[in-house]
């Protein structure tokens, strides 16, 4: 049986292999294992190696690896002299080399797997971002459709076209004013609404109308008032 004293586990010689294996599996503290193996006799280390190596070849548990590591480091010289351990040590070496080779492949696969996962994560983020943009575009299209259904027509007005229309309106207005002015100055121009209204409404009775002789008499009395006499300078020029 094995006994624990402080930080050291004491193994008895010729102890049962199952008890040794159980004790080693229950302890994985590097400090306790190293102190125990250093204070251990070579024969006990050989017995412990005979028990741990076959178990290690079947299932490489971390606690067994710690025990074998310190046994080989501390008592490796003595173990090479034990003949019945040579085959077990060779098998352990082959197993460790194979495990190291597999570990290299595992690390390589792990790196590739991490790269693939990172790419997949980036691709998923892009898909999420594009889906969000698509939803925003659908919302904008839905709003535009609502505006069209409501009957709101949005017309883009060209400023140059507006200026041309304003110039045409001003030209038409000027032409209209000139035509009205010419019509009003012509001898055949119609009377204003107010004057025509007076002419139509005001009718002189026949009994009050003047005869031709009376009209000539009135003209003789009125015309001299509107005749402007010529200046003495003009009369002198005519006499010359």
Curated annotation (Swiss-Prot):
GO biological process, one term: maturation of SSU-rRNA from tricistronic rRNA transcript (SSU-rRNA, 5.8S rRNA, LSU-rRNA)
Bias-annotated ranges (Acidic residues): 130-148, 204-217
Location in the cell: Cytoplasm; Nucleus
A Pfam family matched in the record: Utp12
InterPro entries per record: SSU_processome_Utp12, U3_snoRNA-assoc_WDR
Sites bearing Phosphoserine, chain numbering: 231
Region (Disordered): 125-148, 177-240
Highest rank taxon of the organism: Eukaryota
Protein name as annotated: Uncharacterized protein C1450.03
Annotated organism of origin: Schizosaccharomyces pombe (strain 972 / ATCC 24843) (Fission yeast)
Phylogenetic lineage: Eukaryota, Fungi, Dikarya, Ascomycota, Taphrinomycotina
């Amino acid at each position: 049986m094995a006994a624990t004293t402080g930080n050291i586990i004491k193994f008895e010689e010729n102890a049962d292999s199952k008890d040794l294996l159980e004790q080693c599996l229950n302890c994985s503290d590097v400090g306790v294992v190293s102190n125990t193996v250093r204070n251990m006799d070579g024969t006990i280390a050989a017995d412990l190696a005979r028990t741990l190596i076959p178990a290690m070849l079947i299932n490489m548990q971390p606690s067994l690896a710690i025990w074998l590591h310190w046994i080989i480091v501390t008592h490796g010289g003595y173990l090479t002299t034990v003949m019945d351990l040579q085959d077990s040590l060779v098998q352990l070496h082959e197993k460790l080399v194979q495990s190291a080779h597999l570990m290299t492949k595992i690390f390589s696969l792990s790196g590739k797997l991490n790269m693939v996962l990172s790419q997949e994560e980036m691709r998923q983020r892009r898909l999420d971002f594009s889906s969000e943009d698509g939803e925003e575009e659908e919302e904008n299209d839905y709003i535009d459709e609502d505006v069209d259904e409501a009957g709101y027509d949005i017309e883009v007005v060209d400023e140059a076209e507006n200026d041309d229309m304003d110039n045409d309106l001003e030209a038409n207005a000027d032409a209209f004013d000139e035509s009205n002015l010419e019509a009003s100055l012509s001898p055949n121009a119609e009377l204003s609404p107010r004057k025509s209204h007076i002419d139509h409404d005001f009718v002189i009775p026949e009994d009050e109308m003047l005869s031709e002789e009376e009209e000539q008499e009135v003209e003789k009395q009125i015309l001299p008032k509107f005749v402007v006499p010529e200046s003495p300078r003009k009369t002198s020029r005519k006499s010359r």
